[in-house]
Amino acid sequence: MSDQSAAAKVVVVGSINADMRVGVERFPGPGETLAGGKATLTPGGKGANQALAAARCGVRVEMVGAVGKDPTADTALSLLSECVGLGGVVRRDILTGTAIVMVADSGENSIIVISAANGTVDSASVRAQAERVESANIVVCQGEIPSDGIAEAARRGSGFVVNFAPVIDVDSDVIRMADPLVVNEHEAALVAAALGSTTPHLEDDPDVALRELLGLGCRSVVITLGSAGCIVGGPEGFDSVAAARVEAVDTVGAGDAFVGALAAELARGRTLLKGCRFAPAVATATVTKPGAQASYPSTAEVEDIRRGEHA
C-alpha cells in the first residue's frame, strides 16, 4: 500500500443488508406467480457494498451503520469484517436490513429493500460516531438510511459524496453539499425536480440533466449510465467515460462498486475526472460474476485494473 493510500480514509454512513437472491427466467407481471431457481443469502446493502469496494481499492474504510441481533447479521457483515472497520456498526434489537433480489436470465435485476435496522441510522446515530465521521477524507452516503442521518453526515464530512439510490426526501442544501452527487439518469431527473427544475423528460437526456443539476447549485455531478459508462461535470470541466464491453452475468452491485471506487480515488486526492476514468473499470469487472459483494475484484485485481488504466 502506498503512503498516499495508507493516509486516505473513507467512512461510509449507510445501509447493511443480507440479500436474498433468487434466480428467475424473467420478472413476473402483476398478479403472476413464477417458480424461482436457485436462492442464496449473501451480504449486501448499498452502504456495505460501497464500503467493501472502497476497501478493495486499497484505502482505509470504516462503516457507520446498524444491524440486528438476528442470525442474518453475521451474513451481512461477513465480507466487510475482512477489510472494513466495524467499530461504528451498532447491533440493535430489530431485524437486519434485507433485500429481496430477483435476477433474470438476462442478467438484469429487480430489488425490494426492507430497511429494518438501517432505518435507525439517524442523526443521533451519526452524532454518536462524530469523531469517526470527522476523521475521514471522504464520507459516503446513500438513500437507504433516514434523511436526517444523511444530513448529519454531510455536515460533519470534510468531503461528502452522496449516491441518491433510491432518491429520498432530503433538504436541498444537503444535496448541494455533495461533491459529487452520484445518480443514474432516472435519479438525476428526480433530484433535479426536487431542486425545483421544471424541465421535462430529463431522464431521456443525461447531458442536459447534468447541466441542469449544476445550474441548480450542485457542486459536481456524476451520472452513471450502466454499460455505457458515465458522464461527469463540475468546476474541473466535463467528461464522458465509456465502459468496456463485456458479457454481463449479474449487474447487482455494479453501481455501488463504481461509487466505492470513486470514493477511494477521491480520498487519495485524485481529481473527480480522474476518479471517474477509473471507477467504471472496477464496476465493469463486477458484472462478469454473480453476486454483489462476491463479485467485487480483490485488491490485487484492482491493482491490475489500475495498471491497465495507466498502460
Predicted regions and their residues:
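Conserved beta-alpha-beta core of the PfkB/ribokinase-like small-molecule kinase fold
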Residues: 137-208, 228-230
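A glycine-rich helix N-cap at a beta->alpha junction
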Residues: 79-93
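Conserved phosphate-binding/catalytic loop of the ribokinase/pfkB sugar-kinase fold
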Residues: 66, 88-91, 101-138, 143
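Short beta-strand scaffold segments in enzyme catalytic cores
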Residues: 52, 98-102, 110-111, 223, ...
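Glycine-rich phosphate/adenosyl-contacting loop at the front of the ribokinase-like
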Residues: 1-64, 71-75, 248-249
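Conserved phosphate-binding/catalytic region of the ribokinase-like
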Residues: 1-10, 169, 193-195, 199-311
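A short, aliphatic-rich alpha-helical micro-motif
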Residues: 130-134, 175-176, 215
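Short gly/ser/thr-rich secondary-structure transition/capping motifs
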Residues: 82-83, 119-124, 160-167, 241-242
